[in-house]
Amino acid sequence: MPQFTKEQQQAIDDRGHDILVSASAGSGKTTVLVERVLKEIISGTQVSELLVVTFTKAAAEEMKTRIKTALTKELAKPGVNRKYLREQLNQVDTANISTIDAFCLEVIRRFYYSVNLNPSFKILTDETQAALIKERALREIEAESLTDENSGIRYFYDNFAGDRDANSPRDLLLDLYNFAMAKPEYRSWLKNLAKIYEVNNNIVKSKLWQNQIKSYLLNTFVSLQKKIEEYLNNPTIETKELAKVKEDFSLFTQNLDKFIDAIKNDEDYDQQRNLLRLCKFEVKYRKSAKWDEDIQEFYAETQKLKSEAKSQIFDIFTAFYATDEKEQTRIMQESQKIVSAISKAELALIDRFNELKRNENFLDYSDMEQLAYQILSADTSNSQMAREFYQNKFKEILIDEYQDINALQERIIQQVKNTDKNTLFMVGDVKQSIYGFRQAEPSLFLKKYHGFASEENKHEKRILLSDNFRSTEPVTKTVNQLFKSILSSDFGGIDYSKEGQLIFGAKYYPDALPKASEIIVHKKQKDIDNDNNGIDFSEVEMVLARIKQLKKEHFQVLDSTTGEVRALKYSDIAILTRSHGDNLEIMQEFAKRDIPLFITDAENYFQTFELTVIMNYLKIIDNPDQDIPLVTVLRSPLFNFSEKDLAKIRINSKNSGFYSAVASYVGIGDELSDRCKNFLNKLDELRKFATTHRISELIWSIYAQTNLLEIMTGLPNGEQRRINLEALYERASSYESAGFKGLYQFINFINRMRRSQKDLAQPLLSKEAGNAVRLMTIHGSKGLEFPVVFYLGMQHQYQLRDLKGNYVINPDSLGITLRQEHYRVDSLVKAIGNVTKKRQLLEEEARVLYVALTRAKQKLILVGDIANLDKKVQDWSIELDQSGQLSLADKLSVTNPLGFMGPALAFDKHIVINMNDISNALDQSQSVLYVEYKDSDNFEFKKDEDKVVGDSKNNNYTMDKLISTTKKLYQFDYPFKDASETTAYQAVSEIKKAFNDPIETELENSRLLSSTNRYLQPIDTKPNFLYQTKFTGAEIGTATHLILQYYDYTGDGSEKQLDYEIEELIKQKKLNPDIVPSLHKDQIQWFVHSSFAKSFWKNPENLQREVDFSSLISAKNLFKDFSDANAKILVHGTIDGYFVSNDGIILFDYKTDHVNKSYLDKSINLIKEKYTGQLRLYEQAINEFGEEKVIGKYLILLDAKQVVEVK
């Protein structure tokens, strides 16, 4: 039985009111949540009466697993109600323990009619495909509106015309869409965006000024006023040497006081503007070298304060007082018109986007939440029924990671909540709210955090879980030391020093373990902070050196599985970075040192070597007149042209494009010209192939023709490379399944993904990466823990691009820049919007830092390559106030993590040691070791065990490996000849006999091979009755399938209807009229009126017919004794039909095979055996790509007029 703290037990046992659990990192929140659910179930609340909401599928699955494990343990106890507990255990998998999206989807499936939705909708799971449809909608809106000079859209587009940055009007509309879709009433939200611009010729009296700008100005200048007063009250300033300094500051504060009073008293705008212009430092004075040292130091501090004050005055004036009131009013009025036009354009985009999705019967993720909210909130009888259904169903609603909820999700939960019938249990940590880019609103958590804290509040309760059971004491001390100075009530919304600190609870760590956190710094020679948005590679050198040391000294860690102390493994180490932009370079550095590295969230998919090769091949298949892609393909191991070869080709044709140069070289007549001819022939074949086949088939054909999969598998990290290539095929197939076509459009789609920095994550290996160091982004590490954590990127510049563009979007406003004839000017909404956005971004960056540092269990190592370190240490020493806090102004001026960390780390108060002395220093008592890495430090790297070498951008290194591997491949006696003697593309019609025929599968594989290099089935003998007509059995079967494909289940079902539908197919030239006399209409009539087809008539919208699919199937599942266990074959086919029932998918296939009536059972069994494999393929394809799963497979035997189930 776990021992819970008093607060944990309270969170488990408390009932009868809403509860917010604020659970700090490592405090066991998931354990508490599971234990609470278990207690609910034991006390009689069925698992089906609980709604448990998480924010990821993985978290939902983990939650289910933990609950099942807990119930299983409970079942083993004596005296329990085993029947009841078994029932609950069996219900866990189908219970409402899911993501918010999955719950919304259930609401829609159950009450789709409330919003007039076709129940056979398909989920558009690929966000990038949704983005393509959205872009299509946007282009249609533009085409319809931009030609009209009087249109509102044209008016607002003109305001952004000529922008050179990314902030175009199209970007604005697409960004605004994401904000709108997270709002419960997005239409009214969009329409109200223009209202904030109303000033009514009195800016100071406007709601914008009174509600937002006034408080910001007062907070800023009162803070500055207090800081100056502290200096004026310091005795040092009374010395005669500083008399002029005192006079200067005194005159400044007198004017500042008048300005502050004017703000407080709401004096008119122009008066405030004039008073602010008087806030200057005008007294002249100079520092003397003769002054005492303490006076010189104080003088330096006053000059820094003076510079800060001047900067604040300038920033405030340019943002809020740049023009007089008359001009400012005009700017606001013009901006209001533009924002009104933007809102109308956005609504038009949303409506068109929805229309295009509905035409294809698609729903995307934003639809799920919006439609679910509409169903639950509308003032209709259907919505009331939906609300009451869920309010009565659930006795408690439990929400995990509540800090990540947005306004729409919160409102959905509130619709299910009923004070008289159920309660809310919310668990989260606002310090870990790091998903602002997904419109998460931590303010929702904070509102409850403060509101639930009151002892007078009897209906709502707050519980704090502060004990950290993950980390050693030095790690918790380091985290607390940092965040006491960063997070406060006015920055982050929580007073960390009083309520947010971690309490060391992991007292199970042996005392003898080395625990101290480390800060390893290198003094960079030149400050290039402004240009450095990534990792400095001396940081990687420091990490490599420290890992080397840790391995060499057999650093001891506590194994969480065995409870025993053991030597450090590579897999115990995680390297955390803010972004993934440097992953490939870091992989290269680790590869050079033979230290295994595994990238767990490598969102650089299209930058990997193998994807670069195949994407360039696709580009030249689409258009060969592209020199860079063409040369890349020629130089690749697919064709192995050397640099010398390419030079000869270019010299022969100096002025043409490279494709023309290759074609021209064919006439030279040497060995290279033969290779050029071979390349051009293959390219021509693929270009022709591309015009008649799907993109996915083209990709697989390239793999088969070039052995690209085998080549890449032979390289280091080859299995990951192979999976990457297979995933491209899957993505192309998904792209086409969504209705998109064309190689050119597919390439553009991929390019757009890369440009928008939405590169795809590499599909991870199903197995873990073994003994390798993990490299991941901080966002990717959330929820994980590691014995040793390296944090890189202390100098990584925060991305504040949103503030520099021509618009800024916040939860309650859209601020724009107004374009004038010769200049641009920010509206007041944009000015205060910049302030709000910057604060939100910096608060989130502080939380990101918190998440990173709390991943460490035993050792936290901060790594930084810092320019001007000694100067920075001096500045940091004076930035904290007496309570150890950074001022709000200092926090809001931070530009990188070091700006938060530097002052709190107090470098000046600690002894700095060298890298070589770390081991000896680990016995010291301090919780943090300050380590300097010098360029003279030299660490030899030797090869170690379990190497995993990553990608490299070193062309020679990569190319040598590739060419070597390619030569081995072609000189090798290939053991899997059966794979090489078949194309990787197979039609179901060709493999269905080989799949399941008990006689044929016993033959040698070569019996099934033909000159076309496919596994071919023997041609079936035609049934005797078919010889009586001039049409073959296949032709009649095809015609029958066609009629059943288009049969209308909303008609009257009569013979006249059937005749009418046949006539329509003939008119549409889909059916040959001569075949009609040969059709067996009685078979068709039998089937459409059979009991099997009854559901088709009731819910025809749930019926899908003639569904094309392509799927990768393991060759060993298709062909017995296939030699390569890992080989896959592309299978393409068409499913006759399936019906989506409430329980799942019912799959069926029509068969017109002749049935011998004299031996009916035997004939049916033979047909069943013949086609079982085919239906299993169909089932596998549907289960692999669809949301619902197949629950039944049936053969429709038209000749026998029977429906036969296939197991």
Swiss-Prot record:
Residues 2-472 form the UvrD-like helicase ATP-binding domain. It catalyses: Couples ATP hydrolysis with the unwinding of duplex DNA by translocating in the 3'-5' direction; ATP + H2O = ADP + phosphate + H(+). Residues 492-783 form the UvrD-like helicase C-terminal domain. Heterodimer of AddA and AddB/RexB. The heterodimer acts as both an ATP-dependent DNA helicase and an ATP-dependent, dual-direction single-stranded exonuclease. Recognizes the chi site generating a DNA molecule suitable for the initiation of homologous recombination. The AddA nuclease domain is required for chi fragment generation; this subunit has the helicase and 3' -> 5' nuclease activities. PANTHER family: ATP-DEPENDENT HELICASE_NUCLEASE SUBUNIT A (PTHR11070:SF48), UVRD / RECB / PCRA DNA HELICASE FAMILY MEMBER (PTHR11070). Belongs to the helicase family. AddA subfamily. This is ATP-dependent helicase/nuclease subunit A. It comes from Lactobacillus acidophilus (strain ATCC 700396 / NCK56 / N2 / NCFM). The lineage of its organism: Bacteria, Bacillati, Bacillota, Bacilli, Lactobacillales.
